[in-house]
């Protein structure tokens, strides 16, 4: 064939287009096979029982289906013909695409044979590679087509529906049906078709021999050759890494195996006639048990080849070779690849370390980086496909590698280095192209003996393009584009490889060598990312997810491999590379796989890291707990006993010797590994993996590993804080707030110390967790310490205080437990003193304290509701008492008519206990707030001081609400005002409500003398209170009055004065009582009057003096003191 014809045939362009088209068709066949093999995604009518007879008929008669005379068989198809057409059009067109692809492939292969093209991977690399790729892609398409079990039904049913709808079958059906029948036994038909192409195919494959032998060496040979080592020869470290066949150095061995196995499978004739072909074929058979057709679809090399050759005459020796090779693979390949992986781990780690330290070496040694990536990818893919498919083996350890994560991590490390230092690579290779390659190419062109015009124009353009390059283009961030140059070189390879070409490439190897070098250098300027994908793409994991997950699980079990575990989420970013524009429907599924597995891997890593952090926190908390003051009692006791002679020399039996804090640091031998050591080691490894990358992308989603860790840490810290509280709903036990605070501080202190190592925002994690603990429920809907402590204080401490087993001691500023048998299991003072209230405020914060206050106020208002009911029941009598309280005779007849007076006092005391507890909690909050925010506390207190009785009530309440949130005490409690305001009143008018409030104070005032009869109403100087908590009445009277009269917009002072007068009269009348039982604790009760005045800012001692002589109070104090000392 003439040279002009070679130009016209456009072999390079057709190979490029058909290879890309072939990949698309192959993926479509894969997608159809995958869809039809899964009942969930299979076309619905293929699963319908009513359609079964039609499907059997179509399958049996295919392709000769008589649609018009088969209505009884095809009735269901006729009913659903429109739906079938709609659903199967894509499937049918995909099969038509296969047929058209086949036609174009054979046309091109025949043209190449007619041109008598010469193939040599070392010279015309692109031409040879594209030729072999096309053969393998075409074979894979046909093999996959034959593996689609429903192919006849899909094609036949579509054609039947088409004929029913349009009156005639699809024009392509006849040829398509015939093609499907021909490829029922695909390899037999393919070998027949490829017989004429044996010379070209075998020639191309034989050019691989030297390269394949060199790339198929074992780890020992690699080691002795110092493969990938930059430091084995220091003087040559900056010399450019060149080769006569640059692209061959990082060409995948898996790709070569596919070429050789499938090539000799189709053109097997040369195996008996050519010893070189036979040697190459046998060597390749000893490499793998399986080769990949596409994704997880594989060809079982030895079985398929043996089955084919066994059916052919004269191939007995080849069958024996196959069996021998299979035995060799089973016996040796696992160990062979295991040793190569071990070598690569060491060699690539060294390479990465050197390049990271001296990134400038990426210029001259860029080839080493891509070789390393290609070698790792080959070993990983070999392991994956054999682990997936080799199910029965005597040596399962050959197909499992617990250190695979390190290899994946190194692959990602090299990729990251190349991307990070892309400018270094570009600057070096731009100068190489402009100052060396262009000059050498120019010299070679001038020395060519023959150079046709077309070739001359192309090569001259090469020199021109390369000579025009300058460094400013890199500095200015200019985008380079050399795809045109590389396509021209591809064309030139085609032109110079035909038999009758004036310029033969194999006669001018120097031209091929320099052009292959130029192609690599040009790719370093504009296609580094594509080259990274070509050499290191591991998207195969997207289709071997079970193996992927298994490898990840094995990595987590090896503590030494934990630091490399981040490689698995990073590999998920590769999945985007397995998509193809001819099969867009795959994209969402692949995206889901990538994101789901990336998410699950990071979730597991974050979970493991947070577990490790929290375990160490728990250990730290245990150490911190040993330093609590309560543990020093034993030490003090022992020290005291040493001074006495009675101390025993030996400890009592059953009393274990308690280790002193710090004993855990004493170690006789450093080889002794403690649990803390193991945890710290694991945490170090996990921190390295979680902190390896700040972010990366998976299918256009940006992933931040630190966010996974932050969310897990936050959730775990929330649960840990609640666990530290030790709340037991059955026994109503809970940890003291001060002890919980010490534990929380131990946790927080350790997490803060890890901030710079974990990569997570430790401050944010702590802030969020602690903030959530100030709410009733956390972000997961679980109870927080705010809820637990609120419930405990209400249900345990305050309930017992209401029943009289716990009293408020103003002297101790705490609630105190009274010594009674079997009624309580905790000491009230340990949970309510100043330090505990401060710790509670520190833990719950302003929000938590507000929640606590709201719950307290709910209980207060429920008591107020009951009090109002009692007032309403006695309203008529109370109205008379209010008018006649100064008339003893009338009062003597009215007072006995009151009902529920003791109940009123009891409920008011409960309110007082609750409000007293709230006041103590508020004081704790004020101290904490002053400590944390003194610059805020000052202005708040100053603002409160500006409030006067004349200030608008809304403004007053707003200021008091602000002050109350900071823990500052107020004359009017805004929380109580709001709680009472929220009570749903009945139909009574505001005037009636106000009247009830006034009468409530009257009811209380006239009921006070009843307290004198209670033996518990004795005033204790030691506790500065009463054993029945009636001293809390004063707070209840003042706070409730202030809230009620604020709500009704009345003068608080006036009504409190009225209360003082009525109460004074009632107590003075008690002095005239002759019954000693009724006056038993008269003096103690009299002291309540002074307590009321001290509690209120609205009342003064002068006001009290006007209605209750101070001499009585003085006498009462003296009597109480005398009685206390006598007792």
UniProtKB/Swiss-Prot annotation:
Biased-composition ranges, Basic and acidic residues, are: 652-666
The Gene Ontology terms for molecular function here are: GTPase activator activity; protein kinase activator activity; protein-containing complex binding; TORC2 complex binding
* GO biological process terms held by the UniProt record: actin polymerization-dependent cell motility; B cell homeostasis; B cell receptor signaling pathway; cell migration; cell morphogenesis; cell projection assembly; chemotaxis; cortical actin cytoskeleton organization
Task: Enumerate composition-biased segments (Basic residues).
Answer: 639-651
Q: Which GO terms describe its cellular component?
A: cytosol; extracellular exosome; ficolin-1-rich granule membrane; membrane; plasma membrane; SCAR complex; secretory granule membrane
- Source organism superkingdom: Eukaryota
Tell me the keywords, alphabetical order.
Answer: Cell membrane, Cytoplasm, Disease variant, Membrane, Transmembrane, Transmembrane helix
Q: What is the effect of changing residue 519 to L?
A: In IMD72; loss of function; decreased protein levels in T-cells; decreased interaction with WASF2 and poor formation of WAVE2 complex
Key word Cell membrane present in the record?
yes
Residue ranges of the region described as Disordered: 638-670
- Give me the segments passing through the membrane: 996-1016
Topological relation to the membrane, as annotated: Single-pass membrane protein
Coiled-coil annotation reads none
Tissue and organ expression note: Expressed only in cells of hematopoietic origin. Expressed in neutrophils (at protein level). Expressed in T-cells (at protein level).
Q: Where in the cell is it found?
A: Cell membrane; Cytoplasm
Task: Please give the clinical condition linked to this protein.
Answer: Immunodeficiency 72 with autoinflammation and lymphoproliferation: An autosomal recessive immunologic disorder characterized by onset in the first year of life, recurrent bacterial and viral skin infections, severe respiratory tract infections leading to pneumonia and bronchiectasis, and poor specific antibody responses. Patients also exhibit atopic and inflammatory disease alongside chronic hepatosplenomegaly, lymphoproliferation and lymphadenopathy, and autoimmune manifestations.
- Task of the protein: Essential hematopoietic-specific regulator of the actin cytoskeleton. Controls lymphocyte development, activation, proliferation and homeostasis, erythrocyte membrane stability, as well as phagocytosis and migration by neutrophils and macrophages. Component of the WAVE2 complex which signals downstream of RAC to stimulate F-actin polymerization. Required for stabilization and/or translation of the WAVE2 complex proteins in hematopoietic cells. Within the WAVE2 complex, enables the cortical actin network to restrain excessive degranulation and granule release by T-cells.
Similarity-based family = Belongs to the HEM-1/HEM-2 family.
Question: Whom does it interact with, and what assembly results?
Answer: In hematopoietic cells, component of the WAVE2 complex composed of ABI1, CYFIP1/SRA1, NCKAP1L/HEM1 and WASF2/WAVE2. Interacts with ARHGAP4, PIK3C3/VPS34 and PPP1R12A/MYPT1. Interacts with mammalian target of rapamycin complex 2 (mTORC2) components, including MTOR and RICTOR.
Q: What is this protein called?
A: Nck-associated protein 1-like
Organism field = Homo sapiens (Human)
């Amino acid at each position: 064939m003439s040279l002009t014809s070679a130009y016209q045939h456009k072999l390079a362009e057709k190979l490029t287009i058909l290879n890309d088209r072939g990949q698309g068709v192959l993926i479509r066949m894969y997608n159809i096979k995958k869809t039809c093999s899964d009942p969930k995604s299979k076309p619905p009518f293929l699963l319908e029982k009513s359609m079964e007879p039609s499907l059997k008929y179509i399958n049996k008669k295919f392709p000769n289906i008589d649609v018009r005379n088969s209505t009884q068989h095809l009735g269901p198809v006729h009913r659903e013909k429109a739906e079938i057409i709609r659903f199967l059009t894509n499937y049918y067109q995909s099969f038509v695409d296969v047929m058209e692809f086949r036609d174009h492939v054979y046309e091109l292969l025949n043209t190449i044979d007619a041109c008598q093209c010469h193939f040599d991977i070392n010279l015309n690399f692109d031409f040879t590679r594209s030729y072999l790729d096309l053969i393998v892609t075409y074979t894979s398409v046909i093999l996959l087509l034959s593996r689609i079990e429903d192919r006849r039904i899909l094609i036949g049913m579509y054609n039947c529906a088409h004929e029913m709808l349009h009156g005639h079958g699809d024009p392509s059906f006849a040829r398509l049906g015939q093609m499907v029948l021909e490829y029922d036994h695909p390899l037999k038909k393919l070998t027949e078709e490829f017989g004429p192409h044996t010379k070209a195919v075998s020639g191309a494959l034989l050019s691989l021999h030297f390269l394949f032998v060199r790339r198929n060496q074992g780890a020992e040979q690699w080691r002795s050759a110092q493969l990938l080592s930059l430091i084995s020869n220091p003087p040559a470290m900056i010399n450019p890494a060149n080769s006569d066949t640059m692209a061959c150095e990082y060409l995948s061995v898996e790709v070569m195996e596919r070429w050789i196995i499938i090539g000799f499978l189709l053109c097997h004739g040369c195996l008996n006639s050519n010893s070189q072909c036979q040697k190459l074929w046998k060597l390749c058979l000893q490499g793998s048990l399986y080769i990949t057709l596409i994704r997880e679809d594989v060809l079982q090399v030895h079985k398929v080849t043996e089955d084919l050759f066994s059916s052919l005459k004269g191939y007995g020796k080849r069958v024996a070779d196959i069996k021998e090779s299979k035995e060799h693979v089973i016996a040796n390949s696992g160990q062979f690849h295991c040793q190569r992986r071990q070598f690569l781990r060491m060699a690539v780690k060294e390479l990465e370390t050197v390049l990271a330290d001296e990134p400038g070496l990426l210029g001259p040694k860029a080839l080493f980086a891509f070789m390393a990536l290609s070698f790792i990818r080959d070993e990983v893919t070999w392991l994956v496909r054999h682990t997936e498919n080799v199910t029965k083996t005597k040596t399962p350890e050959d197909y499992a590698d617990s250190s695979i994560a390190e290899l994946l991590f190194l692959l990602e490390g090299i990729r990251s280095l190349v991307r990070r230092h892309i400018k270094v690579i570009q600057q070096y290779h731009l100068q190489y192209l402009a100052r060396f390659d262009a000059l050498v190419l120019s010299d070679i062109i001038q020395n060519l003996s023959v150079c046709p015009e077309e070739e001359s124009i192309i090569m001259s353009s090469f020199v021109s393009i390369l000579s025009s390059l300058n460094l400013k283009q890199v500095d200015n961030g200019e985008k380079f584009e050399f795809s045109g140059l590389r396509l021209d070189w591809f064309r030139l390879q085609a032109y110079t490889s035909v038999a009758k070409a004036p310029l033969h490439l194999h006669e001018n190897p120097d031209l091929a060598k320099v052009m292959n070098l130029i192609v690599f250098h040009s790719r370093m300027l504009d296609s580094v990312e594509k080259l990274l994908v070509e050499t290191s793409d591991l998207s195969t994991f997207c289709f071997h997810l079970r193996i992927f997950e298994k490898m990840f699980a094995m990595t987590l079990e090896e503590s030494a491999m934990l630091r490399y575990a981040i490689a698995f989420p990073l590999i998920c970013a590769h999945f985007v590379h397995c998509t193809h524009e001819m099969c867009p429907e795959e994209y969402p599924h692949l995206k889901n796989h990538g994101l789901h597995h990336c998410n699950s891997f990071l979730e597991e890593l974050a979970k493991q890291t947070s577990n490790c952090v929290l375990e160490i926190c728990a250990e730290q908390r245990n150490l911190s707990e040993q330093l609590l003051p309560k543990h020093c009692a034993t030490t003090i006791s022992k020290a005291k006993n040493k001074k006495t002679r009675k101390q025993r020399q030996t400890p009592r039996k059953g009393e274990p010797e308690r280790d002193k804090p710090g004993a855990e640091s004493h170690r006789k031998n450093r080889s002794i590994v403690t649990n803390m050591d193991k945890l710290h080691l694991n945490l170090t490894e996990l921190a390295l993996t979680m902190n390896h990358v700040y972010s990366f992308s998976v299918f256009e989603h940006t992933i931040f590993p630190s966010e996974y860790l932050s969310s897990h840490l936050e959730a775990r810290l929330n649960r840990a804080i609640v666990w530290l509280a030790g709340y037991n709903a059955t026994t109503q036990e809970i940890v003291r707030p001060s002890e919980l605070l010490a534990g929380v501080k131990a946790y927080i202190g350790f997490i803060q110390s890890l901030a710079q190592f974990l990569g997570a925002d430790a401050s944010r994690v702590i802030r969020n967790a602690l903030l959530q603990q100030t709410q009733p429920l956390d972000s997961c809907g679980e109870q927080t310490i705010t809820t637990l402590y609120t419930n405990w204080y209400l249900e345990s401490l305050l309930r017992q205080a209401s029943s009289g087993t716990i009293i408020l001691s103003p002297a101790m500023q705490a609630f105190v437990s009274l010594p009674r048998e079997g009624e309580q299991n905790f000491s009230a003072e340990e949970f309510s003193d100043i330090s505990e209230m401060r710790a509670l405020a520190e833990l719950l914060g302003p929000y938590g304290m507000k929640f606590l206050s709201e719950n307290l106020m709910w209980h207060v208002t429920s008591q107020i509701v009951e009090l109002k009911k009692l007032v309403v029941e006695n309203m008529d009598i109370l109205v008379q008492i209010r008018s006649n309280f100064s008339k003893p005779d009338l009062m003597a007849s009215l007072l006995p008519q009151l009902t529920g007076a003791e109940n009123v006092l009891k409920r008011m005391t409960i309110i007082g206990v609750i409000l007293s507890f709230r006041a103590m909690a508020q004081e704790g909050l004020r101290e904490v707030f002053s400590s944390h925010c003194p610059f805020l506390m000052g202005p708040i207190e100053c603002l409160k001081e500006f409030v006067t009785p004349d200030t608008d009530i809304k403004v007053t309440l707003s200021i008091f609400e602000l002050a109350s949130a900071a823990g500052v005490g107020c004359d009017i409690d805004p929380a109580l005002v709001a709680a009472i305001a929220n009570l749903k009143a009945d139909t009574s008018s505001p005037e009636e409500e106000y009247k009830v409030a006034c009468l409530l104070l009257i009811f209380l005032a006239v009921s006070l003398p009843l307290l004198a009869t209670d033996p518990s109403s004795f005033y204790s100087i030691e506790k500065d209170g009463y054993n029945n908590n009636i001293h809390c009445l004063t707070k209840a009277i003042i706070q409730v009055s202030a809230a009620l009269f604020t709500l009704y917009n009345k003068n608080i002072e006036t009504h409190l004065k009225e209360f003082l007068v009525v109460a004074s009269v009632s107590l003075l009348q008690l002095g005239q009582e002759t019954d000693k039982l009724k006056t038993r604790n008269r003096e103690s009760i009299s002291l309540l009057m002074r307590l009321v005045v001290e509690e209120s800012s609205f009342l003064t001692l002068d006001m009290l003096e006007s209605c209750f002589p101070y001499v009585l109070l003085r006498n009462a104090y003296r009597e109480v003191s005398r009685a206390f000392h006598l007792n």
